Amino acid sequence: IIRRCIQRFFSLNDGQSWSQKRHYQEAYIHGHAETPVYRFSLADGTIVSAQTKSKLFRNPVTNDRHGFVSTHFLQREQNGCRPNPILQDKGIRPPAAGCGMSLSPSQSVQMLGSRTYGVADPSNTGQMAGARYGASSSVASLTPGQSLQSPSSYQSNSYGLNMSSPPHGSPGLGPNQQNIMISPRNRGSPKMASHQFSPAAGVHSPMGSSGNTGSHSFSSSSLSALQAISEGVGTSLLSTLSSPGPKLDNSPNMNINQPSKASSQDSKSPLGLYCEQNPVESSVCPSNSRDPPVTKENKENSGEASETPRGPLESKGHKKLLQLLTCSSDDRGHSSLTNSPLDSNCKDSSISVTSPSGVSSSTSGAVSSTSNMHGSLLQEKHRILHKLLQNGNSPAEVAKITAEATGKDTSSTASGGEGSVXQEQLSPXKKENNALLRYLLDRDDPSDVLAKELQPQADGGDSKLSQCSCXTNPSSGQEKDPKIKTEEVSGDLDNLDAILGDLTSSDFYNSPTNGSHPGAKQQMFAGPSSLGLRSPQPVQSVRPPYNRALSLDSPVSVGSVPPVKNVSAFPVLPKQPILAGNPRMMDSQENYGANMGGPNRNVPVNPTSSSGDWGLANSRASRMEPLASSPLGRAGGDYSAALPRPALGSSGPTLPLRSNRLPGARPTLMLQMRAGEVPMGMGVSPYSPAVPSNQPGSWPEGMLSMEQGPHGAQNRPLLRNSLDELLGPPSNPEGQSDERALLDQLHTLLSNTDATGLEEIDRALGIPELVSQGQALESKQDVFQGQEAAVMMDQKAALYGQTYPAQGPPLQGGFHLQGQSPSLNSMMSQISQQGSFPLQGLHPRASMVRPRTNTPKQLRMQLQQRLQGQQFLNQSRQALEMKMESPTGAAVMRPMLQSQQAFFNAQMAAQQKRELMNHHLQQQRMAMMMSQPQPQAFSPPPNVTASPSMDGVLAGSAMPQAPPQQFPYATNYGMGQPPEPAFGRGSSPPSAMMSSRMGPSQNAMVQHPQTAPMYQSSEMKGWPSGNLARNGSFPQQQFAPQANPAAYNMVHMNSSGSHLGQMTMTPMPMSGMPMGPDQKYC
């Protein structure tokens, strides 16, 4: 009845005196509205009179309009007009799509992502659910709207839960029926039912939301629906969900991102509510919880009491979940519950469901809201773990609770349950608590089962980065991850830490994805569907395991810290997943896991520049995907939008992509870079000096912080210093704040619970490893740098290939410098580093170091300072000669001198450069002002004409040497490459253009100016004045279009600003650029 009622209600759009749209408009304007009585007939011929009354639901706290609570009054005419108010709160599309909203005070279910529907009133929902489901006291109806609203609900929608949403169907409705109901509800066709798991599902998250609500609303119905999903409906839906994930990520993700975040927060309480309401229809909370709780319950019920026992089991599961939530984290329990319930639901419901669930749960929105969902789930998980630990629950207890809450689906509860179990082993000590947190986080992608189940769906989705595979891949990757994690967890804390790093990465795949909504959009731009969502998943799946391998097996990759950094980059990575999926990327990440993670994050922006540099073909993609990761963009213009984002993965994948994308010479370059591994990081970094900026300071953290700045998580780096290993940077501003809160909580928790916890975490995260790895990396890089520096300096011809590699090594040099101020940072190595990216490598690192120094981690700060000191000394020696010349002949010195000078200035003349930079920033702003109008006009030229200046700007922003780089790109690439200005220039213009366009370098630029005023001044000095002057000389000489310093700035800003919306930032890059990246990513 309710389903038909809703269908009828939503079908009354044309030729009616009223329509649901008009009805809701009226409700939105007047706060309430009611429809005339309308009739419809049931399958049995019963005539039902219905009237829908909707009230505008406002957030009691913010008084924001969140959605509509629609009450449908139904009367069976046969039965004598007995009004049977089956109050079905149907989530209607709320005016405020993204507003989070707590529908029910008790449920605290927010109408996050109410973009599709508002959440029904909890009380109404409960009534409705009860009426519909035999007074099952399900407030699930409410949830549907919310679920619907939040990205998580989008994701959750995809689950059986959504199908069983009471609003969508009557208690007896099967998942399919409910889905049908959902479809109308979703403002979509009946196919919506299936759609909820399809890409449309994300779009139709409203229906999904409703499904969430219904899931527990009608315990048995919901469970049956879930079971049906798991048995078959779910499978098809899930398989579709894999697809929808990308779509969700593409479209809703943007909308849902914040809601998702709110949803996560809401979810936590909703989850608790959900548990409490288990009898009532925990679904309400779960819906906001992304349905994972409901899914979990369903899963439990489905798995434990597949059929009849579902109701009891459901309530039982709910109780357990409630235990988990209330005990472990009433607010944060949701995350764990969401993850594990989702996981469980996915597992039990169906592989298909699992896939979405896994994605949703482990990927935390990998499907519908890859980034926001995953980030939220991670945050939730963090909260859960934190809360569990805070509440004094031992890891064993947490594991037990989680396992119980999850029911038989221990693997299902992998994120919470298995993680808890693993933590159980670790319960003896706080270290184990940390391990628990890490493991839970790691397990956050409880794709163990999901991966297994999803893998079938994915059909080797890990390898394939098919869109559907997107959700599947993450599961698959996650599955691997969980396995690795589980083994590692059981292994030891170090393994856990490695896992944690990896987990953080995977977690932050989602979170980053979340944070990189532009990335999501980019995914939409360039096959984001297949790439974007699925990418994040694959990245997650591939990367986390890789990270683990990296952290465990490849200390060079900075241990788990790099993974964490990578996680930081993961926000980009979610778009990078394809890259991440690439073995190369893994290899590259192995070496540059952390380095690239950070740089790549910036790279994601710069990669476009790279793309431009590597090929204008990419540039076109880059233009529209400037946000996309430059490395990816470079690797593949077509992937630029979606993939470029995966900056982290990009470093490795960038090369692979380059391999594929780059013309012969570029593949060679890639090979060179890959040969030096540094190139991997370099692959990204070279593309955007900004990346080096991120990388050099401290690849793992500095880079991360730098990247975060660009990604709008600049403030995160500080928190991250201690907790960033555990927690990746949030993708969203909200995610960031949320993540920051989480990080703060985790930090407090770890700090309070264990004074040495942070040190342990550092050790676990591989900070010591970072140093040792820095040494290993340094030796490695030393070889590479020595080789590449020599190649760079000696083989100007190979400059392009070597330039980037040289840059890469410098970056790595910066990294290893950062990791240790080893002799490896020999003059040559550093010169190569600083020569190719003296300022970039050093500057960025300096900037990065500053952020790191800001962070509590003295070890890293000291390490960075030490390395920087050595770098400065070496670079100073190298640049000393140049230094004298570069100030005067900034334009003339261009390549080597200026690079060195820029480097020298950046390090030795930071103050001077700051002043100059301020002056030049103004100039640049003026130029930007001039260029902003021209961004579109200049955008294409920047590819070619402006690209030199762009590259210079990017590189320049990354380092004072950038100015030389601008014009003599060789300079940008290496001090030892001044002879190759024309060549470098030729190559780098596209890169410059792309970088500028991407804005990552600008981000980096912004960041280092931010992080390192010295950087700014040196940059500004070398770049604005030198650059502008050079623009006058080089652009004029080299590129007529850029004869103007203003033109150059304009070009630079155009490409970066127009593409990344960083035009404003470009002028600010020097002064306020840091905000540019944040704004850009926010």
From Swiss-Prot:
Domain of life: Eukaryota
Compositionally skewed regions (Low complexity) per UniProt: 144-167, 208-219, 349-371, 984-1001
Annotated compartments: Cytoplasm; Nucleus
Keyword Transferase: yes
Asymmetric dimethylarginine found at: R860, R866, R877
Annotated spans, Interaction with CREBBP: 712-782
Region (Acetyltransferase), start-end ranges: 786-962
Modified residues (Phosphoserine): S251, S269, S394, S427, S551, S554, S722, S988
Residue ranges of the motif LXXLL motif 3: 723-727
Tissue expression from the record: Expressed constitutively in uterus.
Modified residues (N6-acetyllysine): K316, K319, K320, K387
Primary location class: cytoplasm
Keyword annotations: Acetylation, Activator, Acyltransferase, Cytoplasm, Methylation, Nucleus, Phosphoprotein, Repeat, Transcription, Transcription regulation, Transferase
Activity regulation, per record: Coactivator activity on nuclear receptors and NF-kappa-B pathways is enhanced by various hormones, and the TNF cytokine, respectively. TNF stimulation probably enhances phosphorylation, which in turn activates coactivator function. In contrast, acetylation by CREBBP apparently suppresses coactivation of target genes by disrupting its association with nuclear receptors.
Protein's job: Nuclear receptor coactivator that directly binds nuclear receptors and stimulates the transcriptional activities in a hormone-dependent fashion. Plays a central role in creating a multisubunit coactivator complex, probably via remodeling of chromatin. Involved in the coactivation of different nuclear receptors, such as for steroids (GR and ER), retinoids (RARs and RXRs), thyroid hormone (TRs), vitamin D3 (VDR) and prostanoids (PPARs). Displays histone acetyltransferase activity. Also involved in the coactivation of the NF-kappa-B pathway via its interaction with the NFKB1 subunit.
Name recorded for this polypeptide: Nuclear receptor coactivator 3
Species of origin: Rattus norvegicus (Rat)
Gene field: Ncoa3
